[in-house]
C-alpha cells in the first residue's frame, strides 16, 4: 500500500493553495511599498527587491508539509493629486518561489509568478485619515514540479511543467488615528476576491508519470485588523516600525482543490487526490516590519506568523524611490 500511496501524487493535493500563497507574497510587498513608505513627491516610483521564507504545516492525512523560500522584485508607481490621499497608480512584480516538500524523497516545486495591477485611492476627509483603496490585478505563472517518491527501497522521479493565471480585486478601508508625535494606530477592513486557474499538469519525464486534470480556485477573503506604527527621525534618516495583527477567513474553495489525477498516456480512471480541509476557523496573522531609510534608499526587515499552517516567516528587502 505504501508503494501505491507514494505514487499517488500527494504533492499536487494543494497546488491551488501554493499558487495563491505565492501571489500573497507579492501582495504584501505592494502594500508595504504603498503604506509604509510615505512619499514627498506627488509622482513617485518605488521599487524593492526582497527575499522571504516560511513553512506550512498540516495535520491532514495525504497533504505534505513544506518549506518555501522566495525572492523577487516589486514596483509601485503612484500619482497623487492636489487632495492628500487621492490618487491612482499601477504596480507590477515578479516572484520566484521554491517549495521543498517534507516527503520521503524531498520533492521540489518551483513557481515563477508575475503580477500587474491598477489601484485607486479615495480620501474621505481633509487629512486623509479615512481612506478607501480599490485595486485589481492579473497574474500569470510558470511552474515546475520534481516529484520524488519511494517504491520499496528505491527513489523514483517524475517531472512536470504547468501554467497558472488569474485575476483579483481588493477593497480596503482604513482609518488612521494619531496617538502621539511618533505613534499612529490604523484599524482597517478589507475584502479580496480572486479567481485562479491551473493548467493540465502532465508529467513528461520519469517513472509512473501522472496527468492531473486542469482545475481552478475561487478565493473570497475578508480581513479585519489593526496596525500600530512608530516613526522616529534622525536628521534625514527615518526609522519606521509597524506591528500588525489581523484576522482573515477564506470563504472560497482554495485549500481543498478537489484535484483529479490518472496515470499518463493510459485510459486509466481518474482518481481523487485528497486535498487539505477547508479551514473555516480562519487565520490570525501577526506582522512586525522595521524599515530604516533616508528619503531615497532604505532597508527593511520583517517577521510574521500565521496560525493557519503554523507559518513562521521572515524577510529582508532593499528599496529605492525615484
Language-model features and meaning:
Residues 61-66, 102-109, 144-163, 197-218, ...:
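Solvent-exposed, glycine/polar-rich loop segments of beta-barrel outer-membrane systems
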Residues 113-115, 211-322:
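Outer membrane beta-barrel transmembrane domains
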Residues 189-192, 244-245:
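A glycine-rich phosphate-binding loop feature that marks nucleotide/adenosyl-phosphate handling sites
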Residues 1-177, 300-317:
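Outer membrane beta-barrel translocator domains of Type V secretion systems
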Amino acid at each position: 500500500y505504501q508503494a501505491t500511496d507514494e505514487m499517488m501524487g500527494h504533492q499536487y493535493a494543494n497546488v491551488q493553495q501554493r499558487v495563491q500563497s505565492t501571489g500573497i507574497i507579492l501582495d504584501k510587498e505592494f502594500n508595504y511599498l504603498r503604506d509604509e513608505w510615505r512619499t514627498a513627491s506627488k509622482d513617485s516610483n518605488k521599487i524593492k527587491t526582497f527575499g522571504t521564507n516560511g513553512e506550512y504545516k498540516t495535520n491532514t492525512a495525504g497533504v505534505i508539509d513544506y518549506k518555501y523560500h522566495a525572492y523577487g522584485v516589486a514596483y509601485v508607481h503612484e500619482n497623487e493629486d492636489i487632495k492628500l490621499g487621492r490618487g491612482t497608480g499601477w504596480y507590477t512584480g515578479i516572484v520566484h518561489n521554491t517549495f521543498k516538500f517534507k516527503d520521503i524523497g524531498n520533492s521540489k516545486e518551483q513557481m515563477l509568478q508575475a503580477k500587474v495591477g491598477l489601484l485607486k485611492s479615495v480620501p474621505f476627509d481633509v487629512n486623509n485619515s479615512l481612506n478607501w483603496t480599490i485595486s485589481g490585478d492579473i497574474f500569470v505563472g510558470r511552474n515546475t514540479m520534481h516529484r520524488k517518491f519511494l517504491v520499496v527501497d528505491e527513489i523514483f522521479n517524475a517531472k512536470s511543467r504547468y501554467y497558472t493565471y488569474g485575476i483579483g480585486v481588493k477593497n480596503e478601508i482604513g482609518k488612521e488615528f494619531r496617538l502621539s508625535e511618533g505613534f499612529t494606530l490604523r484599524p482597517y477592513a478589507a475584502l479580496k476576491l480572486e479567481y485562479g486557474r491551473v493548467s493540465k499538469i502532465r508529467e513528461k519525464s520519469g517513472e509512473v508519470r501522472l496527468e492531473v486534470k486542469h482545475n481552478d480556485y475561487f478565493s473570497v477573503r475578508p480581513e479585519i485588523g489593526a496596525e500600530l506604527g512608530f516613526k522616529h527621525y534622525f536628521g534625514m534618516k527615518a526609522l519606521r516600525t509597524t506591528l500588525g495583527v489581523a484576522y482573515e477567513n477564506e470563504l472560497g474553495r482554495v485549500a481543498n482543490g478537489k484535484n483529479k489525477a490518472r496515470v499518463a498516456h493510459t485510459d486509466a480512471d481518474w482518481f481523487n487526490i485528497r486535498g487539505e480541509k477547508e479551514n473555516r476557523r480562519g487565520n490570525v496573522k501577526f506582522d512586525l516590519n522595521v524599515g530604516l531609510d533616508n528619503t531615497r534608499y532604505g532597508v527593511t526587515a520583517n517577521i510574521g506568523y500565521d496560525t493557519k499552517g503554523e507559518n513562521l516567516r521572515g524577510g529582508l528587502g532593499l528599496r529605492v524611490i525615484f
